[in-house]
């Protein structure tokens, strides 16, 4: 692993709130327009040169709407174009230059799927830690089993020094139970992007997660 020096990454909000994870500029823009303030652009399996313009545009949108825009995986481009933050999976930690990310002043989020990965993430002192997957999910092939609400609550209690984000199979119907665990952020993918009325669902999620009125 490309170890980082023994100091914390840039801080972010303790409660990141509703945290959609989307794969296009179109989704970034439409969600920021209706009040989302934390969002991740997750484009997978493309060469950096093929995603650079989208990353530039996403970062500009983040600034326009004063939002926390995280770039998944493409940490070099995130540094180059001064993103708010980067999100890395466990496999990315082995190859990313964590010191370069830290020295650039970017926030860092790390995915975890069990207690071993959680302890590893905590040692790196990231800006936030993602805990998952909570429920079965079809968005991403997962080698691990769903952790469930009880495990999530335990992990949140063990991670009180860090902002936490729950992810994985979280639907509109389940989000209140997730929030009740004390987790500070709720990441969703298909609950928004596959909704028949994405705008209504997003506004309702903002109400349930952040207390923002939906009308």
From Swiss-Prot:
Binding locations of Mg(2+): 73, 92
EC numbers: 2.5.1.3
Cofactor(s) named in the record: Mg(2+)
Functional pathway: Cofactor biosynthesis; thiamine diphosphate biosynthesis; thiamine phosphate from 4-amino-2-methyl-5-diphosphomethylpyrimidine and 4-methyl-5-(2-phosphoethyl)-thiazole: step 1/1
Annotated GO MF terms: magnesium ion binding; thiamine-phosphate diphosphorylase activity
Catalytic activity: 2-[(2R,5Z)-2-carboxy-4-methylthiazol-5(2H)-ylidene]ethyl phosphate + 4-amino-2-methyl-5-(diphosphooxymethyl)pyrimidine + 2 H(+) = thiamine phosphate + CO2 + diphosphate; 2-(2-carboxy-4-methylthiazol-5-yl)ethyl phosphate + 4-amino-2-methyl-5-(diphosphooxymethyl)pyrimidine + 2 H(+) = thiamine phosphate + CO2 + diphosphate; 4-methyl-5-(2-phosphooxyethyl)-thiazole + 4-amino-2-methyl-5-(diphosphooxymethyl)pyrimidine + H(+) = thiamine phosphate + diphosphate
Amino acids binding 4-amino-2-methyl-5-(diphosphooxymethyl)pyrimidine: 40-44, 72, 111, 140
Reported function: Condenses 4-methyl-5-(beta-hydroxyethyl)thiazole monophosphate (THZ-P) and 2-methyl-4-amino-5-hydroxymethyl pyrimidine pyrophosphate (HMP-PP) to form thiamine monophosphate (TMP).
NCBIfam families hit by this protein: PRK03512.1, thiE
Stored HAMAP family: TMP_synthase
UniProt name for this protein: Thiamine-phosphate synthase
Organism for this UniProt entry: Proteus mirabilis (strain HI4320)
């Amino acid at each position: 692993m490309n170890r980082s020096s023994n100091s914390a990454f840039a801080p972010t909000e303790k409660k990141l709130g509703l945290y959609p994870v989307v794969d296009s500029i179109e989704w970034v823009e439409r969600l920021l327009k209706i009040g989302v303030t934390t969002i991740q652009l997750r484009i997978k399996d493309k060469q950096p040169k093929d995603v650079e313009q989208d990353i530039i545009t996403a970062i500009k949108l983040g600034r326009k709407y004063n939002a926390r825009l995280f770039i998944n995986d493409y940490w070099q481009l995130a540094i180059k174009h001064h993103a708010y933050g980067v999100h890395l999976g466990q496999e990315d930690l082995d190859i990313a230059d964590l010191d370069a990310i830290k020295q650039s002043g970017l926030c860092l989020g790390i995915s975890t799927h069990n207690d071993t990965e959680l302890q590893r993430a905590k040692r790196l002192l990231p800006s936030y830690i993602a805990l998952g997957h909570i429920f079965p999910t079809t968005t991403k092939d997962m080698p691990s089993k769903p952790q469930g609400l009880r495990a999530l609550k335990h992990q949140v209690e063990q991670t009180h020094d860090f902002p936490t984000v729950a992810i994985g199979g979280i639907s509109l119907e389940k989000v209140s139970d997730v929030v009740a665990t004390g987790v500070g952020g709720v990441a969703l993918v298909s609950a928004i992007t596959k909704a028949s009325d994405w705008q209504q669902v997003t506004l309702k999620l903002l109400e349930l997660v952040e207390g923002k009125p939906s009308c």
